[in-house]
Amino acid sequence: MSRVAKKPISVPKGVEVSVRSDMLTVKGVKGVLTFPKSDNVNVVVDGDILTLSANDPSHVSLAGTVRAILSNMIKGVSIGFERKLELVGVGYRASMQGENLNLSLGFSHPLVFVPPEGITLLTPSQTEVVVQGIDKQRVGEVAAKIRSFRPPEPYKGKGLKYAAEAIMRKEAKKA
């Protein structure tokens, strides 16, 4: 069996997990997340411990995937997720206008990004953007979408980058 699927998940206080025949629902302080349940994976709730098992050996990897998703759902509704982006470059600025994010990235026009439902955007400074939410996948998707407006270039490192991202720098051509 998958080593990931063998490990039980502990459910913290304030988080409620319900298992139906076709849906897994996780309710917590920050919100509610649902995930479609596969018939090939058994989910057993025993007090504050969740255990998963596969119906047959060919679905062991699926059980590991479902376990990882469930673990992220539990963490999301209790703590939440965030990704930080940094703007590097002269004149590159970020600001909030209501719920929308305004980005000045050296184009002839400012970019306006409308966040999807369930995602919160913050700008602690003009060169930082913080993406927050309860769904890890959506937080990552939104952060990647914002980064795609001006990815960092390898010569000067200008652009939008993740806070912990190391940019591989290239040396300029010597004449």
From Swiss-Prot:
Record-linked Gene3D superfamilies: Ribosomal protein L6, alpha-beta domain
Record-level GO cellular component terms: cytosolic large ribosomal subunit
Pfam family, one: Ribosomal_L6
GO biological process, one term: cytoplasmic translation
The keyword Ribosomal protein belongs to this UniProt entry's keyword annotation: yes
Key words of the record: Ribonucleoprotein, Ribosomal protein, RNA-binding, rRNA-binding
Single GO MF descriptor: structural constituent of ribosome
SUPFAM superfamilies the record matches: Ribosomal protein L6
Membrane spanning residue stretches: none
HAMAP family: Ribosomal_uL6_B
Family, similarity comment: Belongs to the universal ribosomal protein uL6 family.
Subunit structure comment from the entry: Part of the 50S ribosomal subunit.
Function: This protein binds to the 23S rRNA, and is important in its secondary structure. It is located near the subunit interface in the base of the L7/L12 stalk, and near the tRNA binding site of the peptidyltransferase center.
PANTHER family: 60S/50S RIBOSOMAL PROTEIN L6/L9 (PTHR11655), LARGE RIBOSOMAL SUBUNIT PROTEIN UL6M (PTHR11655:SF14)
Entry protein name: Large ribosomal subunit protein uL6
